[in-house]
A protein has these predicted regions:
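Conserved donor-binding/catalytic core segment of Leloir-type glycosyltransferases
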Residues: 4, 222-238, 244-248, 262
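Short alpha-helical donor nucleotide-sugar binding micro-motif in glycosyltransferases
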Residues: 289-290, 297-302
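Aromatic "clamp/platform" in nucleotide-sugar-dependent glycosyltransferases that forms part
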Residues: 310
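A charged, aromatic-enriched C-terminal amphipathic alpha-helix characteristic of glycosyltransferases
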Residues: 366-398
Length: 401
């Protein structure tokens, strides 16, 4: 069987979506070497007047770079869609196939040769799969990861209509959490061609390290006492604007313990968070963005990791932290409760959220957490090899339809 993947992956931003998609595809390729695989990463480039206006106003422009990239032994072909005034107008039309002309002209042979299309990201990537089905008769599967369901369609009525068309005409819709699938129902999706299949964790990259290695990291970054961590983008969606309040509440609720707060990542609110934490005299270590090796080491030093997001697809970072032995306390957004799996460690949104989250963190810190047991449970239940088979099982179904 020949499988064509259409993905939303930026090699310069190897974070949640990139890694979740890559790990799943890599696991499928390993499990089913009898298949042939082609992966196309759809990216964007600003052109014409649209690009000129962005340059004049100092906004970030998207430019064409390489034609492909290889990561972790997997090759990705890159196809660029132009962003200009013409493309913006086409996007508003019901028949928007012309928006993807660059993809069809650059990938016609790949489309004709494949037996099934597996698309990772609802829009516009899933829309390409929709038109491949209409024009070439190829069946398709779409995996939805988060904001392609819980944000974009709710903010734009044109996108909403098109995402629903994508869902209704696919062989299978795969949602990374039950919550995300429920959100699709709220959107208006009524089909039964769906399943919830959580994301996994790469147990070769996330695992417990030795006490000697932990102490080395602690000493290097001046991590003292109990270490409460966060890993991810420092932005409003992750509720980063409330980090200082959460950290202060933890410190005040448990004055008998010394606390370090470790923030792994970067984002638009970093400077603001740093300033507020400094004003509150909190001991916070900001590490900046880290590759997986660095993330693993910091997670191993954490007593508890927090994930107070306002919205989330699944929350791969939860299982990664668990694989390293760290307990996690988070919000009830998206698939976070499913990833955490411990009801008491999920804090409902609402009044006093920050204080209630802090209270639960302190309770977990002062309980007897078996790091080895946490890690083993995660590795037994969230290994990518098990998760990947969920998607692969639909390939034959699609080819038969």
């Amino acid at each position: 069987m020949k499988v064509l993947y259409i993905v939303n992956m930026d090699e310069n931003n190897k974070k949640g979506l990139f890694m979740a998609t890559h790990e799943k595809i890599k696991a499928i390729m390993k499990l089913h070497p009898e298949n042939e695989y082609k992966i196309i990463s759809v990216q964007f480039k600003d052109t014409g007047l649209f690009r000129a206006i962005k340059k004049i106003t100092g906004k970030k422009t998207y430019d064409k770079t390489s034609d492909e990239f290889t990561f972790d032994g997997v090759n990705y072909k890159k196809v660029y869609l132009s962003i200009d005034m013409k493309s913006k107008n086409i996007e508003k039309q019901e028949d928007d196939r012309a928006r993807f002309a660059e993809f069809f002209s650059g990938c016609k042979e790949d489309i004709e040769n494949c037996d099934i299309v597996s698309c990772h990201w609802g829009y516009p990537h899933g829309r390409i799969a929709y038109w491949i089905n209409r024009d070439f008769g190829k069946p398709y599967i779409v995996t939805y990861h988060g904001s392609d369901v819980h944000t974009m369609p709710f903010n734009n009525s044109d996108i909403k209509k098109k995402v629903l068309q994508i869902m209704e005409n696919s062989v299978q819709n795969i949602f990374v959490s039950k919550k995300l699938m429920d959100t699709a129902r709220e959107l208006g999706y009524s089909g039964d061609n769906c399943t919830a299949s959580r994301n996994g964790v790469n147990t070769e990259k996330f695992y417990p390290i030795s006490e000697e290695e932990k102490n080395e990291i602690r000493n290097k970054y001046n991590i003292k006492g109990k270490n409460i961590g966060f890993v991810g983008a420092i932005n409003e969606v992750k509720r980063s604007d409330k980090f200082a309040e959460i950290f202060e509440a933890i410190k005040n609720l448990d004055s008998n313990n010394e606390y370090t707060f470790t923030v792994v990542g970067d984002g638009p609110l970093k400077s603001e968070v740093e300033k507020k934490c400094k004003e509150k005299n909190l001991h916070v270590v900001f590490t900046g963005n880290q590759e997986s090796d660095g993330v693993r080491k910091f997670m191993n030093t954490m007593d508890v990791m927090i994930l107070p997001s306002k919205r989330e697809g699944f929350g791969c970072v939860v299982t990664e932290a668990n694989a390293c032995g760290a307990a996690v306390v988070g919000s009830n957004a998206g698939g976070i409760p499913e990833a955490i799996g411990i009801e008491e460690n999920v804090v409902n949104d609402g009044e006093g959220f920050e204080e209630r989250l802090a209270k639960r963190v302190v309770e977990v810190v002062n309980s007897n957490n078996d790091r080895d047991a946490i890690s083993k449970h995660t590795m037994d239940n969230f290994a990518w090899e098990k998760i990947a088979e969920d998607e692969a099982s639909f390939y034959g179904k699609g080819a038969l339809n």
